[in-house]
């Protein structure tokens, strides 16, 4: 497929909201033993559950390495397409393409540079060259032309849009030293506006407490629909998360979007702090150059890290009393969707959650 020397804005394409209609969803099969415990077997079961839940609402493609293709095909339901593709890890939200659409129904991919969430400064593993090719390969599978930004680092989990000209992100991530230190905040805004066709960017300060991706916005904030947003929250003022969420709430409550609307902010309480157990820590291979999983480390658990499908919402369950409160809140926010919970601790142990391991392809 073509690599286009232009931009989404010049060509009349925009990034749609995740709540708009999808043609399908991509997931990468987990396997690396220095990130997923017990050879990724528990995580693979969780990924199967997520893929199966989403496949009730839209077509799902799972890509797996050559060494895991047969295993993935065996474990996944027949209606889920499985395709062989090299990768370094299973975070397609971040390594995959950001799709844009135009008014004629055409779809293109934006292929950002990927450097493992910080490159040689504070990246989570090395090398990452296979992951940096994932976006192009998915565009090829989908027969979609792409824009390639080889000199601009961005992960899909660091942005959320309303599809009507507004993007929300965090300074903690986009202004981090390991992403685009050669660019000013204003220059980063210019790139985002040009390639996603935006009019306004709302900057939150920080993401979820101890988020190892430098505070990805998709773990603390999501767009329900234009003008209506969901925010991770805690009522415990002694929790470090409280200060962060309160700061986000104050920013969002005093902002307007590209259309001049005040934002309607809905709070969804996070679970009680979830810590890595001794057994979970010992199940991860220790490898130099990758982030260790230590007993007692707090995980960045949030119900906001959910996936919005066609007529469905798939959200993480943590075995916490707030699981059911989150389910009820999501039902209220998405009255026309079926809300499905999936046990997601094994995904959380790897450093993210359901939104992080999925990437939607818009219908156009």
From Swiss-Prot:
Its EC number is 3.5.3.12. One of its GO terms (biological process) is putrescine biosynthetic process. The keyword Iron does not apply. The lineage of its organism: Bacteria, Bacillati, Bacillota, Bacilli, Bacillales. This is Putative agmatine deiminase 1. The active site is at 356 (amidino-cysteine intermediate). The keyword Cell membrane does not apply. It catalyses: agmatine + H2O = N-carbamoylputrescine + NH4(+). It comes from the Bacteria. Keywords: Hydrolase. One of its GO terms (molecular function) is protein-arginine deiminase activity. It comes from Listeria monocytogenes serotype 4b (strain F2365). The gene is aguA1. Belongs to the agmatine deiminase family. It is an enzyme of class 3 (hydrolase). NCBIfam families: agmatine_aguA, PRK13551.1.
């Amino acid at each position: 497929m073509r690599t286009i020397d232009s931009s989404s804005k010049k060509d009349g394409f925009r990034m749609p909201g995740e709540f708009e209609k999808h043609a399908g969803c991509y997931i990468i099969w987990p396997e690396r033993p220095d990130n997923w415990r017990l050879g990724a077997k528990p995580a693979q079961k969780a990924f199967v559950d997520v893929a199966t839940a989403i496949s009730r609402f839209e077509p799902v493609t799972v890509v797996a390495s050559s060494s895991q293709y047969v295993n993935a095909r065996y474990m996944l339901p027949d209606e889920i397409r499985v395709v062989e593709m090299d990768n370094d890890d299973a975070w397609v939200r971040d390594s995959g393409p950001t799709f844009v659409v135009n008014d004629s129904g055409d779809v293109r991919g934006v292929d950002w540079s990927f450097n493992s969430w910080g490159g040689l400064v504070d990246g989570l593993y090395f090398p990452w060259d296979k992951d940096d090719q994932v976006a192009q390969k998915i565009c090829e599978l989908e027969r979609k032309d792409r824009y390639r930004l080889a000199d601009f680092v961005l992960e899909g989990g660091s942005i959320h849009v309303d599809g009507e000209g507004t993007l929300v992100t965090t300074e903690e991530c986009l202004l981090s030293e390991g992403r685009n230190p050669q660019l000013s905040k204003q220059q980063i805004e210019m790139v985002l506006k040009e390639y996603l066709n935006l009019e306004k960017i709302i900057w939150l300060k920080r993401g979820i407490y101890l988020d190892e991706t430098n505070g990805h916005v998709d773990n603390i904030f999501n767009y329900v629909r234009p003008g209506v947003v969901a925010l991770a929250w805690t009522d415990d003022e002694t929790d470090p998360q409280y200060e962060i969420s309160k700061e986000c709430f104050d920013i969002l409550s005093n902002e307007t979007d590209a259309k001049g609307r005040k934002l309607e902010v809905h709070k969804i309480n996070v679970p009680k702090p979830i810590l890595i157990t001794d057994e979970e820590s010992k199940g991860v291979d220790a490898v130099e150059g990758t982030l260790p999983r230590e007993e007692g480390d707090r995980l960045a658990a949030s119900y906001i890290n959910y996936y919005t499908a066609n007529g469905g919402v798939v959200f993480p369950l943590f075995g916490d009393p707030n699981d059911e409160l989150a389910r009820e809140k999501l039902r209220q926010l998405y009255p026309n969707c079926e809300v499905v919970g999936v046990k997601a601790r094994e995904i959380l142990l790897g450093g993210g959650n359901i939104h992080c391991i999925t990437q939607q392809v818009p219908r156009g």
